[in-house]
Structures are given as structure tokens and as C-alpha cells.
Regions:
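Central helical "cap/lid" subdomain
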Residues: 191-236
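Dinucleotide-binding Rossmann-like beta1-alpha1 core, especially the glycine-rich loop
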Residues: 47-126, 245, 286-287
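Glycine-rich FAD pyrophosphate-binding loop
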Residues: 23-43
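Active-site lid/adjacent beta-loop-alpha segment flanking the redox-cofactor pocket in flavoenzymes
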Residues: 230-325
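Helix-loop-beta segment of a Rossmann-like dinucleotide-binding subdomain
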Residues: 79-91, 114-120, 124-162, 264-269, ...
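N-terminal Rossmann-like FAD-binding beta1-loop-alpha1 element of flavoenzymes
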Residues: 4-30
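Helical element adjacent to the flavin cofactor pocket in flavoenzyme catalytic cores
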Residues: 138-195
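C-terminal catalytic lobe of FAD-dependent flavoproteins
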Residues: 289-368
Length: 368
């Protein structure tokens, strides 16, 4: 049997970030990962470090996280492949322009200034090969992108260096209260007793929550990505869109990384994901409409990951409603990568201080 202060279920980016922050504050931490670190969404996402077009409830967290990203090498001893390249949402018709203009006005009304309006000529100075149909856009020049697998592994190494233990291939099959009042977690590699439990199990977070009595209406999806052959550099910022869905960037080596949330087919219990070629083609067509001079570029590889989501588009972050000393952070709806550095810090605050330094009420389980 293993005794720790905090057991973290899930060894993705959020779990490793929580482990790092807790270990640095002197807690004995054990991360229990069913597969291996960065196996699922944390290692295969688009790597966007985005404050742009965030849900209003997420903005304080996203801005705080961005400050950490800007000094990420100081945080974990690794640059995580991070570059401040900016992110931009482009409108190509009047309806899209109006939606983005309304968003900009709303941000100003709320007192946020991280999103900036760009007229068409300013967009083309930023992206010279952009379509002439572009009529305006909303951008966040201080946003950026990083390497997701690289980043998650860097946080895992830093957590271990700070004293945390990470057990891979160690699925949690039951959680109950032990005779001494502590939490008892049954795993494939023995029993773990912990004073507190943190659930960062991603697309399986609802199952861990159910073990301690919290019913959660989590769904899962399998967002796809693809990478092309290298082409001469033509694009600096990350280009995003909600309608149609798109996340598009040129990597430092010249390849085009295209995603945006179009799903593959499959399940979360071992059935191999089946890439939806029609969905990939639709994403590629969107890129070519935005950058019509691009021409034909070979696609080298396509893949998907498994992510949890809620109907309202924001995660669960906060305490269990049914049990003491249990904390949840999952269901980030495909945009949790950027938030993980601050989420780990907030989880450490919740565990140790009993409160978070940023507003998290909107992410409570009480909303369901």
C-alpha cells in the first residue's frame, strides 16, 4: 500500500501541472495514469496558446495562463516549443464580420483589451497571402502556440524533479473511504491511500467522478488533426475559426498543421479511431479558401485524440459536491491546453488553501 498526501488521477497536462504545483508546495504527490503521460488529448492537440474568443468565464484564467507561457522556460526548464506568434480569427463575409465586431464590443464593455480589431488591410500586412475576401478580423497578438507532447512531458519531468511520483500503466478501478477516513484508491498496481484526490482524467473524468458519487453529464469526442509536407514560410499567426471550424498554423519547420475540432469516429474504450476523410478535406478546403495561392500540398499524416466536453463549452473545475477533499478538473472541450499551467496552480491552491485565487464559480458541478 502507498500513502500520499494527494493522489491525482490522470497523467495528462492538467494532472502533471497539478502535480508540479503541489510538489513544489511540499505535498507528497502520486499521479496515477492508466496509459502513459500525454497519451490522449494532452499529447495530440493543436498546441494553441489562445486567449482569443474564450468563453467569458475562462478569460481570467486564460490571461493568467498566458503570463506563465511567456516565461515557460523559467517555469519548467524547457521552452516547450512555445512561440508568441499571435492568433487571429478572420471574417470573409458580412455575417462573420458582424459576429467578430460584436465580440470585440463585448470585450471592451467588460473591460478586456487582449483582443484587437483588424481591418482587412491590416490583416493582409500580417498575412500577405490572405484571401481578398477577408473583410476584417479579431486578433490577439500576444497569443501563440507550443508543442503539446513536448510540453506535457516537460511538466511531467519538472513534477518528478520536484518530488512527485508518476505511475504509468496504473488504472484506478475504485475509490472509497478507508477506515481511517482517508481516500482509498484501488489500482491495477495496488492500493493507494491519500488525504485528497484530484480528478484530471480528461475524457474519462466522469467515470472517476462517479466513483465518489458525482454524476457528471460529460460527453467525449475525437478531434482530428493533420500535418502536411513543408512549404516555404508564408504564415506567422495561428488562424482560427468557429464557422467553419478551423485551427491552422505553419510549424517552425514549415509544415501546415490543420485541425479545428472536426471529429473522427470511434469510442473511448479501445476501439481504434477512424479518421473521417471528408472532415479532413473540409478543413483543407477552408485553408485553401483563406489562402488561395497555397496550391497542392501533400498531407503526411492524420490523427485524432480523445477529449471530454460539456454542452455549455466550459470545463468542470472545483470541489466535489458529494465528497470532502476531492477536486475535479476535466472536460475542457478541446481548448484546455493553454489553461493547464494556471489550472495546476489553482488546483494546488484548492487542495492546500481551500480556495482559488481566480474566479472559478462558473465551472462548478452545481451548474448541472
Amino acid at each position: 500500500m502507498t500513502d500520499v498526501d494527494v493522489a491525482i488521477v490522470g497523467g495528462g497536462f492538467h494532472g502533471c501541472s497539478a502535480a508540479l504545483n503541489l510538489a513544489r508546495r511540499g505535498r507528497r504527490v502520486l499521479v496515477l495514469e492508466r496509459d502513459h503521460v500525454a497519451r490522449h488529448a494532452s499529447g495530440v492537440n493543436a498546441g494553441g496558446v489562445r486567449t482569443l474568443l474564450r468563453h467569458e468565464a475562462e478569460i481570467p484564467l486564460a490571461l493568467a495562463a498566458r503570463e506563465i507561457w511567456h516565461r515557460i522556460a523559467d517555469e519548467v526548464g524547457d521552452d516547450c516549443g512555445y512561440h508568441t506568434v499571435g492568433q487571429v480569427a478572420v471574417a470573409t463575409n458580412e455575417a462573420g464580420r458582424e459576429r467578430l465586431a460584436q465580440r470585440h464590443a463585448r470585450m471592451i464593455e467588460l473591460g478586456w483589451r487582449h483582443e484587437q480589431w483588424f481591418e482587412a488591410d491590416a490583416l493582409r500586412r500580417w498575412m500577405p497571402t490572405l484571401t481578398e475576401a477577408a473583410s476584417g478580423g479579431l486578433g490577439a497578438p500576444d497569443d501563440g502556440a507550443a508543442s503539446p507532447f513536448h510540453t506535457t512531458m516537460a511538466f511531467a519531468r519538472a513534477a518528478r524533479a520536484a518530488g512527485a511520483e508518476i505511475r504509468e500503466g496504473c488504472a484506478v478501478t475504485a475509490i472509497e473511504v478507508a477506515a481511517d477516513g482517508r481516500w482509498s484508491l484501488t489500482t491495477g498496481r495496488g492500493v493507494v491511500h491519500a488525504e485528497q484526490v484530484v480528478n484530471t482524467a480528461g475524457a474519462w473524468g466522469d467515470r472517476i467522478a462517479a466513483m465518489i458519487g458525482d454524476p457528471v453529464p460529460l460527453r467525449y469526442f475525437l478531434p482530428m488533426m493533420m500535418i502536411t509536407a513543408r512549404v516555404p514560410r508564408f504564415l506567422a499567426p495561428v488562424v482560427i475559426s468557429a464557422d467553419p471550424p478551423l485551427s491552422f498554423k505553419q510549424t517552425p519547420t514549415g509544415g501546415l498543421l490543420i485541425g479545428g475540432g472536426r471529429p473522427a469516429r470511434g469510442d473511448r474504450d479501445g476501439t481504434p479511431d477512424r479518421i473521417d476523410l471528408a472532415g479532413l478535406r473540409a478543413s483543407a478546403d477552408t485553408v485553401r479558401r483563406l489562402f488561395p495561392g497555397l496550391g497542392d500540398v501533400p498531407v503526411l499524416r492524420a490523427w485524432s485524440g480523445t477529449e471530454g466536453q460539456f454542452d455549455d463549452g466550459i470545463p468542470v473545475l472545483g470541489p466535489s459536491l458529494r465528497a470532502e477533499r476531492v477536486w475535479h478538473a476535466f472536460g475542457f472541450c478541446g481548448h484546455g491546453f493553454q489553461l493547464a499551467p494556471i489550472v495546476g496552480r489553482l488546483l494546488a491552491e484548492l487542495v492546500i488553501d481551500g480556495r482559488a485565487s481566480l474566479p472559478i464559480e462558473a465551472f462548478s458541478l452545481r451548474r448541472f
